[in-house]
């Protein structure tokens, strides 16, 4: 029996849009029954959030999972627009192509986007090189997210995290309760039976909601291929200037990156499996320039998509600690 329940009453009323060409390959005719169940479950969750919470928001980090989540939200509420704004927590160190893609997609879809930068972090000039990855992530991501949620009074934040990404996310509920201080207690999670979710909140508390919890990385790529979802070009292989640093291929994205003695950027064919702040995100050698090629590459891969994330190397259980402090 499948772990994913069928949601026959929440299918999308709109067909996938005919979007721009993504690598010169035709889209498949229909998704598999497995992907259809995942899609229906995610749409059901998105509609549940809209119905149950006073002021929800969708986190938009510009990556592949956010792109799928945004596509699902557009389907869930078609022909109207999603009844909640998008929020991007900008660390000021994102890849330039990510910001350009973000602005383009928001214009195309005509959505409301809130962008928040931690003003204290900017004043202190906190960055990954000057303060280290742990401090940078805490100030410019975790603290910034808490600031934005408090400033706007959001009681539910929708995100694109998946359980297969990392072990702390594997044990987190789809509707993940947060205290008034935005803290997550992994020992105090609510049961989720079938498609029944406990959305009750005490004053000051909030919920993080993960509609893609049951998706895998391969599911994401297969769905992007079938639905022809636009994604940041960084996911496709291309010749890019990188330096090999601490076991990771780091893209020299702008003049703020200081080169170590002896480092010389090399042009290599690379792409990214995951996207974050460019000094903290390693590329992978690849020749996959189309979506079908990426799917084939994923099917043969035996490594984690987060192997290039420098922040995951801070310490043992670093992700769980970050989440307990309010990280998404």
Curated annotation (Swiss-Prot):
Top-rank taxon, per record: Bacteria
Enzyme class of the recorded protein, top EC level: transferase
GO BP annotations, alphabetical order: hydrogen sulfide biosynthetic process; sulfate assimilation
Reactions mediated catalytically: sulfate + ATP + H(+) = adenosine 5'-phosphosulfate + diphosphate
Region (Disordered): 15-34, 304-328
The keyword Nucleotide-binding is assigned to this record: yes
A Pfam family the protein falls into: PAPS_reduct
Family: Belongs to the PAPS reductase family. CysD subfamily.
Quaternary structure (record): Heterodimer composed of CysD, the smaller subunit, and CysN.
Function: With CysN forms the ATP sulfurylase (ATPS) that catalyzes the adenylation of sulfate producing adenosine 5'-phosphosulfate (APS) and diphosphate, the first enzymatic step in sulfur assimilation pathway. APS synthesis involves the formation of a high-energy phosphoric-sulfuric acid anhydride bond driven by GTP hydrolysis by CysN coupled to ATP hydrolysis by CysD.
Protein name, entry field: Sulfate adenylyltransferase subunit 2
Organism: Rhodopseudomonas palustris (strain BisA53)
Lineage: Bacteria, Pseudomonadati, Pseudomonadota, Alphaproteobacteria, Hyphomicrobiales
């Amino acid at each position: 029996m499948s772990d994913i329940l069928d949601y026959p009453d929440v299918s999308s009323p709109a067909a996938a849009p005919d979007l721009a060409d993504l690598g010169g390959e035709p889209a498949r005719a229909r998704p598999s029954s497995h992907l259809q169940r995942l899609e229906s479950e995610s749409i059901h969750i998105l509609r549940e959030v809209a119905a149950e919470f006073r002021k929800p928001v969708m986190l938009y980090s510009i990556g592949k999972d956010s792109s799928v989540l945004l596509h699902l939200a557009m389907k869930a509420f078609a022909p109207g627009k999603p009844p909640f704004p998008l929020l991007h927590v900008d660390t000021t160190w994102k890849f330039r192509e990510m910001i350009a893609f973000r602005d383009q997609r928001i214009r195309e879809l005509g959505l409301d986007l809130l962008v928040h930068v931690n003003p204290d972090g900017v004043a202190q000039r906190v960055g990954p090189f000057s303060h280290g990855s742990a401090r940078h992530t805490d100030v410019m991501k975790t603290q910034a997210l808490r600031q934005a949620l408090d400033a706007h009074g959001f009681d539910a934040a929708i995100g694109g995290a998946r359980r297969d990404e990392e072990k702390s996310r594997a044990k987190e509920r789809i509707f993940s309760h947060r205290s008034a201080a935005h803290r997550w207690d992994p020992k105090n999670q609510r049961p989720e039976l079938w498609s029944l979710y406990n959305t009750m909140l005490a004053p000051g508390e909030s919920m993080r909601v993960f509609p893609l919890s049951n998706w895998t990385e391969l599911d994401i790529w297969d769905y992007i291929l079938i639905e022809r979802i636009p994604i940041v070009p960084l996911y496709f292989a291309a010749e890019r200037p990188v330096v090999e640093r601490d076991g990771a291929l780091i893209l020299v994205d702008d003049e703020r990156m200081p080169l170590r003695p002896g480092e010389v950027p090399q042009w290599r064919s690379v792409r990214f499996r995951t996207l974050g702040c460019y000094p903290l995100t390693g590329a992978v050698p690849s020749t996959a320039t189309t979506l079908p090629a990426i799917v084939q590459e994923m099917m043969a891969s035996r490594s984690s998509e987060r192997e290039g994330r420098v922040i995951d190397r801070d310490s043992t259980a670093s992700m769980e600690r970050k989440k307990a402090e309010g990280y998404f």
